[in-house]
Each structure stands twice: as structure tokens, then as C-alpha cells.
């Protein structure tokens, strides 16, 4: 037993003296560092503030690695010695007493803190008799000490007893005797465990404190000099500019920016107000071994054997428990501490396993059970209860109720367990849901009774994301090997990204396990697809070879590309050798055919990455030439053939002698026969062509080949029938020697009874494959990917011998494209004037109004340029620590880059300049036009535009000359007071209609009455100029106004079946276009079906599985189980719908499993509906990615089915924002028309829109396809903005729930006037918004109102929430490798991953205004731009989703000025639904109905194109004039027809 040192000074409280004496006893087991740590921890509370500040600064320096540990320890010792010596040993001044100067308060306080909170632990630690405890202690200390503060705060428990530095030596007993000077020792003696030399000097009394302090001061100065030298050396090796940076950085790194200290064990912040200490055990509490032998816990009689084997542990329950670390800090047990071998203990009342009563009665009080070796969960079997348990060296304990002090910590644990339970059970049956849908489920689930929280929130989901994802991984591991993992569902991938979850942590390695995981039966998904025989054969038989080929390619690709991450714990463990995959491996004696990874080694990172790649479609499509001509690729090979003409020439035109027949190698060919041509590359198939003419001239024996296009060269690619050819407009002259042989190409016209043959058992093969027989049904447009009925053209008798359909069509197209002038008038001033010019088949006359490119002319009035973003001002980075992430100027949803709409002018003159030879230069046509001003072009700028009608113009007498090539189309402009109908009716009567009421004078900035020559369209001959008056008489006002007058034939509405109808957006648009009457709709989701019924009371709405209904119809049933009449064959004239694709959109390649999924998908069911009913028109609407799924295989198979049925078809991508809504929404559209109908074109855009959102081309098999749209850069009308959409709606608060309110004002914009319609007593419905949690509401309140604001503008402050609680400040605890420090020297990292290390669960923070997860993962995800973002008044909505969440995919969902998310009605308006449109269900049901719908204005634009095709066919058949595309409101009507 070592001798005791002199007692501490009387100024120290007695309890502290006792602790210091205990420490002296244990000195042989502690290193110098640990001794210093513990003594300083005990006395630090009594040191002066100045000394404490110096110590904090040293702490910060060592933590930032600016100070080595050796220098740090020396400086601390020197600092303390100097302070003691300065006072001549007067220890009293070192202590900061209470304000009244009484030391008693300090003593009481210390007693309370030491004994009250730690006292019980102290006794336990002093005993320290358990060998297992001490061994694990020493092994674990080294892992935690390196990353934590070296000197913890005063209340921390005793430091670890591992001799990390090894420099503490046991001094001889004789060296610790009381000093002979007789002076009372000070605190200095407490810190006198220096070197042996020092102690021997003390024994002799040779060194006084002052001298010692001076010596230490010198040592410290030496160390500082050494440190400065090192710094200087480092700086001098750098360039001059870098030296400055270094110096500045040193200056700015002030000690104030230090990281708060953490406990080395539980990793909690020592200055955290929520840090709690274990209050101690009662006196009667027993040790674990003693407690386990207590008879109250025995469940066996004396005669029974206790356990089956010695390996079995007894099981008990524990109630009123607390979990704490060695220092007495209450701490959670799920943050990775147990896994890192940190010793956690628990105390409580232990009860027998059969006792379900959580009260203390009948329990045995136990203390310091543990350390905990593992924790686990059981009872995950679909019931309400989920149990948690601990395993120690002696027993298993199932947790019942926590102690009062531990309850808040344990509540979080329970929350995460119930949260994961909700997620797993939700995803079993809903694999295709989005992140927003999962949030909806979580937020609407009521927590079990007895928990101390009343709702689940997004914050709690993100808080527990790591745990939840691990539960999902565990669930997947228990699944079948061929089941797609739940982990790669869209919502889980979004959660992983947002929360920065680390995948692949193995439960075997972690000391956490799911005990007896119960496998929950997974939902089998939708019913098996009902298919017609034709569709079935195409999908099941025809492509089996293709699938095998894809799988082979997949294997190759796997070997090359698909590498496991190699980092996660899953990748790093060996194969198990037991699972099916391992048993198939060669090394385990298997065949090696399956090539599957061990089931225990399935890399989750790889699975998630692949799923992410499949979902992304690159907006920036690589520049590729449009495949206009494939003839450049036809490299042909000449054959050595014997060629001789048969008969005499049938025609001769001097240079050429035309023949009807030729003999090639004893085979006779005639004009009109089809031949094969050998390709240069023998591995390629033969080229096929029709011989349209044969002749001989100076080039030799020639023929003209009209090429056929094989199906594999179309968009169908490998899915096409190998024997099917397509006509194309491509032809070529070539020598007869290229011909390989004669082939038979048969035209297969649609049968007479085509419409009624749907669903019959048909043979899939059209012709027998004899190697020389082919067939064709369609003509194919290679640029637009359009399959159409072959064109009919009869050759004239005089050119029959050389008539080529391709030449004729190409000549016609070229002829149309070339601009021409006609009807010459007068000549003068070196110009020739004309009455008319034509381009692209459109006539332009003097007096017509025309669209011109925006750059065609400018205005003399320079309007105020749109407000650019204000320049960035300096931001207080301590208050707004995330603002530095906003370095990009681009804001999603901004219209700053939106182009101007077309200029509008009225033609005054059409002329060509006369050349020197006296002839007009007709290749360069010019127009003299009068300019029209739009409201935004006047001095009033954009403000005038907002309130004005979108088709309002102002006349001006300004004239300008433009090139005819700048003309983009014709429009109608009339003087409003000359109309015989209202301006509203006129505007709704057709496309491209404008009006003006005033003239604008740019010089005086005034509005005037328009002059006579502007308004009097019928006044012929007035005004100057040659024939202009006459021209005006034939202006568009007159000739175009006459067109809409109804004639005898009215277009009937198409009887429509809307499958997957939702709430009816597609049908609503078609009704507005006047093209259809929806008689039947199918919608399985009840709330959406009810909404459809509310808006379409005459429609039969089926709320059944579409497969069941089709089966009923195909089996001859007339009604369903509810007695609703089913549509029969021949009833349906138009079929439309948007089948969900999520079931097979996950993986980008087909293999046998995903292929079978696609065969059972709703797309296949929808195609079977089309095949059975054979409607006149078919429309499939889907997400933009539909055209890219599975390397476009889904698109190809869809088109392949339609072509085989006999349909003309095409596809394209449209942007809803270009048709009159303030929202970006790209949609893939597949259109089909029955034989005999005209295949509709895609509608031309009506509005300009942000160019980034208008990239609508599609790349399939490395070929770029575009739709027929020509208005790619501009449009007739300006873009619709958020202000246009919703500025008139009354203000509401977060959580507003009044279903009907009044408007409180008139509509302010043109869009609002259209969308409100003409209600008799206007009522505003569904202007309601989600009630967000208190924390989310506080975040929304602190998002600034400036454009582009989002989470990065949140201040880092504490805020009192509406529920009475307060938020915390986000702590920045790590150095950010990528972004460095802030301008004030503050840290920017919130997790150890910022420094390049693995994530540490202990770094997670919650309840902060800045969500911790966003800076955590921001660097990897574009800084999460747009989350918690506000909409911009002059911008547009992101794609409206089914559930507006501030942290969801849609991003910007906050109102521009109000502190809430957008309301249901605002979302409905962003989709273009009229205010009269009814929705059904709760608020989330309504959001989902709106988010899933097709925007009615987009559907209307498509509907008008279909209507035009119906009218064109009727005109052809009857020869009579038909009413043109029907009365059409400018963008939308108020309600359904």
C-alpha cells in the first residue's frame, strides 16, 4: 500500500479530498495523462475563469491537431503550476466561490453533483473487482480516446485505466512523504506526479514552487518556439500568395470556434443540457450473480434441471430500467456503442419471465447489470408489440418499462422500432410507392398506446433512417433469392440518399440481432394479366430468343461493369457455402451455371446504384444526326452476273432507253418486281428494294430501286418481325449487276372485318419463311418514327414505265418547302411586288397577320429588363452556415431563361429585289410589315401582361422589313369592336386568335385609338401602297373568320373508354376539345373513382381490376358482379389511359424474371384491351421515362403489338408547360389510329417555356427521334407563371381545412378568368393544405421570401415551437474536407464522414432548424437544392407530385409568400384543372388524385389534333365541308362538357 500524500487544502470540499485520495491509491494503474485528466476534471470547476479559458483553447488546439499530445500535457502542467506559484501558494484565489463568498455553497454543489449523481457509481468503480469488466475496459478505451476530447468537462466520470502512453512509473513509497517545510500543501501537490527527478527534489525540499513555475514557463516557451519554427518552415516552402492565405487562416481560426467536448464513452456532448446522470441504485440492489440466484426469480422446483445445457442463458424481464456508461451518463444503447465495445450497464427491477406486470412488485432490485453484450428485437410478427432485449454474460433480459429518468431516451428507441415496423409492413404490399407516399403513411399512422409521443413525423423517419433501412435489409435477407429486394424500391432509395444511410452493416458483426425473425407473407402484386392471343404470342413466344440473348449480354456486362462496391461489410465477408447460390458454385462442387453471388454477399450499394441508374434519363441527350436517310449506310457489292434485256425498249428519251424486262443469270425481272441487293459486309442481311424503272445509258445497264426498310432498322429494332418490311421515302439509281436475286414482297392490307377480329386466335406469322418471301403493311417515317398506312398514288399513263412513289413524295415535300411568290402586282423602286407568297404549303397574302421569330425585329420602346437576381451580399456565416452552398445561379422553376413569344406583324407588302438582269430575285423574298406590340413590349413591361388577356395586342404604325424565312405561321388579328360576338367567344373559337382595341405610340408612351387602315378590314383601296387595300380585303380577318361557320356536317363525339382513369384529367381535356364522350372508365382506387363520378355523372365507372373486367368481356359476359353494363366489341371508338409501369421499371435490362413481370404488367393488359376492342383511336400516356425503360424495350414492344394489330402508330414526348400550365411535366405519348383513319400529329406548343425543360427528343438504339413539332424555340403566347395561376386565392394558414370558402376578390389574370369559369355563385373548394409538424412549420416560417430561397437560407438558431418545445442549434463538429472552413474559421462538417472517415451514428443530431441530414449528404446530391424551397411568383411549379413535402422529390412546394405548403386547389390549378372540378376524399387523397392526373390542357391539345383527323376523314369520305376543330376555349373551359 503506497503512503498517502499530504491532505489537500481545506478550501476543497471534503468529498473532493476523498476522491483525490482514492485517485492517489490507484496511481499505479494510471498513466501520467490519465492522472492529469482525472485530477483536472475534479478541480476544474474551482479554477478561475481565465485559467479555464486557456485550458479550453488548448483543448481546441489538440482537437484540431494543431498541438501534439506531448506539448499539450506539458502546457497544461506549466499553466497550472504558474498560476499556483503566482499566488505564492495561496490556493484560495484559484477557486471561484459563490457570489456571497461562502465556500459552503460550492461544497454542497459538489456533494450534489458528485455524490448525488455519481456517488453510487463511485463505490462500484472503487471496488472494480470484476475481471471481465476490467479486461474489456482496457481493450475498448483506445478505440474511443482518439476521437474524443482529451480532457472532459467536470461532471464526466472517471477516465479509462488503460496505460495508453506507458510513461507513468510507480514511484517508491518513500518519495511520497509530507513536505518537511511545514507549510500547508496547495493544489500544486495534487499535480506533482511529474518526473522521478522532480519528486526526489521535493523530498529534499530543494525546489520551491516559484522556481518550479519559472522552470516550467521556460519549458513552455521552448515548446512554443519549436512549434513556431515548425510552422515557419511549412509556410516558407509555399508560394507568396499561399503564405498570405495561411496567415489569414491562422488569424481567423479563433479559439471561439472550438468543438464542444464529448464524453469519451457515450459520445454525448458534455455541455448538452439534456445530458443526464444515473441517479444511483437503492441500498438493497444486488449484484448480477447474486440477483440471479434469488429465489423470487427461480421458475424451477428443486427436483427439476434448470437448463437443457450450460450454454443456455436464463431469461428474465427487467422493469424500471436505466442504461448508462461507466461515467454514469444515461445513454441510448442503439447508437453503435455496444458494437464498438463501449461498456454499457443497466439497473432496474428484474422479474421472472412469466410476469407481465411492469410495476416494481415482485421484482428483485439489481445494480450495474452487464456490461451489455448484445441487444435484440423480437415479436416482429405483425402484432402490435415489438420486444427489445439485452444479453449479458449471465442472462437474457426482456425490457418492460423504463425508469422515469430513462423514459425520454427509451421513447426514441420505441419510436424507431414502430417506425421500421410501419415501413416494412407498408412496403410488403406497396413496392412502387414514392418517398412522399411513405411519408403519408407514416404521418397518418397512430402510434400505439402508452408511448410518450402522439404522431410520427418526417423528422422522426430521417432520425431513424439508418435503423429502418437496416430492418429492410434484414427483411430482404429473409426473402427468396429471386425476389427483387425491397431496398431498391423508389421510396427506400430516396430515403437512403436523403438521410445518408450506410448500407451493408452486417448483423453478425454488429451486436444487434433480430431474434427469430418472422417472415411476413409478401403481397403477390396485381392479378395475372389478361391478354388476347395475339398479344400473348408476341410476348411469350416471339421473343424467347431475344431474352436469352439479352441474358447472355447481361452476363458479359456483369463481368465487365457490374462491380460490387467492395467497401461495405457485406462485400468483405466470405461466401457462406450453404445457400443455393454457393452450392451452385464450382468451388463448392456445383455446376457454376447460375452465376449468382452468395446470398450473404449481395451488395446493397450495387443494387441501389443500379436501380438509380435505371431511373435516371439524361436530359442532355447527346447530339446525334436525325436518321433522315439510311441510304448512306448501304454499301453494296457488285455480282458477276450475265445480264441481257428481254424485248425492245418501251420508251426512249434520247439519252436513256427504258425496258420492261431483264434476264439476270437465267432469272427474268420485270418493272415492279422486288429484288435483293448484296451488302458490302457479308455479315449483314440483304438489302431489299422494288424495281421501279430499268434503262440503259452511258453508265451501263441501270435500274431505279425504291428501298424497303427492314423492321430491325426502324424504331422497333430487334422486336420487329424478321419478315416484315416497311415502305420508306428512299430510292436510288444503280447498276443491275448489284442485284443478288428476285424476292417476293407481299402487301398485307387490313381485312374487311378488321375491327371485329380483335381477340380472336390468330396466327402470329403473316407469311411462311422460305428465305425469299417478305411482307409489308405500313409506310415508315424515319425522322418522326411514324408507322402509317402506305400512301396511295396512281401514276400517270405517260410516266408509268418510270414512276417511283418515293420520288413523287420527295418532290412534293421539296416543292412545299421552297418559298415562292405568286400573283405579281407592280414594280417600283427596284422591287417587284406580289399579292401572295407560299411556304410549307401555307399561303400568305397582303393583309394577313403572321408569326415571326423573336429576333425578326425589335421594338423602339425598350421595356425594363426582367429583374435579374440581386448580387450576392456578404452573409453572416455563423448565423447562416449553409448559405455557402448556394454558388449556382440556376434556380429550378425560374423563367429567367424563358424565350420571348413570337413577334406578330401584319403584312403590308410582299416583294423581291430586282437583279441587274432585270429579273426579280425570287430566292430572297421580303415582307414589309406593321408591328404589333404585346403588353410586355410597351413601357408598362411585365406588370401590364399579368392583368391583360394573353391574346391582347396593340396596333402600331411602326413598319419594318423582314425576311420571309422568319415567318413561322399565320394567325388572326382583329379589331375588338369590329367583332359581332364577344371577345371571349371569339378567342375560344379557334387557335391563333388575337385582338386589339388600342394602338400604341412608343414615342409618346401613350395608347391611342387605332387608325382606320388598321381597323377597317373591309375598306378596300384605302391608304397608300399597291394593292394593299385589296389585300386587306382578303385578310385573315375575312377569310379565316368565314371558316368556323358551321356547315351541314357535325363531328360526332367518339365513344371513349378511359382505363386507369384516375380522377379524370385525360377525359376532361378530351371533353374540352369536344372530341370524345367518356361512357366508361376503369379506376381501382376508390377515392379517384368517386372523383371521376362527381365530374362525369353519365359515365359508368368500374372500380375493379381491369384484368378481371377484360376476362369477363372476353368470356361473353354482359355485366359485372355489380350489374354494371360492360362495353362490348364495336362499342369503343377511343381507348385512352396511363397504365402504371412501376412493376418493371426497376431494372434496365430484361432477364427471364423481369421479363415475366413485364408480361404480367398493366401495359400488356392495356394493349390487350386495344386488341380486343379495336378502337378507332388509341392513346397511351406515361412518364417521360417510359420511352427509355429497359433500353427502350417497353416502348418497342408496345409499338410492335400495335403494328401487328394493324394500327398506324407513333410516339413522342410533350411538355405540359408548353400548353398553358405553370408546371414542368414531360409526358410520353403513344398515339395509334385504326386502318383508314388519319394518324394524328402531335400538337404544336402554344406557350413558350423554360428551354431546360423542353428537351423532348428521344434516343433509341443510338438513333435520335423527334416528334413533328416545329415550334421548338418559341410559341404564340408567353409562359404561364405561378402568379398567373394562384395570386387571386385568399390567404390561408398551415393546416387550413375549410373545404369551401369564398374567393374574396375578382380574378386578376387571364388564366384565372379561364380557370374560374362562369359560376353563378362562385365557391372556392379544396383550398386546404397539409398540417405540418411544429418543427417543419418553424422551418417554413424561417425560409426567406426572396426567389430561390430554400433550406440553405435557414438560420442556425434555437426557436420555440408551437407545441411548446424548443429546437436546438445544429453543431458543426468536424472539419469538412471538401468545403473547408467558413470565413469566420468555423467548422462545416456535421459527421465524421466529412473528414473522409465512416459515418458515426453518435454524430446524428435532431430537432434542429437546419435538418442535420441535408448538410450530412449535401455534397453528394447537388446540395439538395430546392428542398424547403419557395415557389417563385414569376416561375413555375416542379412536376406536381402526389404529396407535397418540403423534403420530397418535388422540392419547391412552399407558397411564395405564406408559411405553408401549396394547397390542393393550387396544385389542381398548376395541372390546369378548372376550379369547378371536384375532388374526393381526405387531403392526401386529393393531392394524390391531382398529382397522378394528366393536365387537362395537354389532353385538350391532343384531343384537338384527334378531332382534326376525324374531320379530315369525314371530308374525304363525304366530299362536303365539315366544321373544323371545334369551339375551343383559349386554354381550358370551366367545367366538363
UniProtKB/Swiss-Prot annotation:
Residues 182-194 are annotated as: Interaction with PCNA. Residues 1021-1033 have a biased composition (Basic residues). Zn(2+) 2 binds at residues 576, 579, 582, 598. Its main location: nucleus. Residues 8-105 form the DMAP1-binding domain. Residues 1-13 have a biased composition (Pro residues). Sequence repeats lie at residues 1020-1021, 1022-1023, 1024-1025, 1026-1027, 1028-1029, 1030-1031, 1032-1033, 1034-1035. Residues 1020-1035 are annotated as: 8 X 2 AA tandem repeats of K-G. Residues 215-227 have a biased composition (Acidic residues). InterPro entries: BAH_dom, BAH_sf, C5-Methyltransferase, C5_DNA_meth_AS, C5_MeTfrase, C5_meth_CS, Cytosine_MeTrfase1_RFD, DMAP1-bd. The active site is at 1141. It is found in: Nucleus. It holds the Pfam family zf-CXXC. Testis and lung. A zinc finger (CXXC-type) spans 558-604. Residues 1-34, 97-232, 614-638, 1006-1050, 1518-1537 are annotated as: Disordered. Residues 129-154 have a biased composition (Low complexity). Belongs to the class I-like SAM-binding methyltransferase superfamily. C5-methyltransferase family. This is DNA (cytosine-5)-methyltransferase 1. It comes from Gallus gallus. The gene is DNMT1.
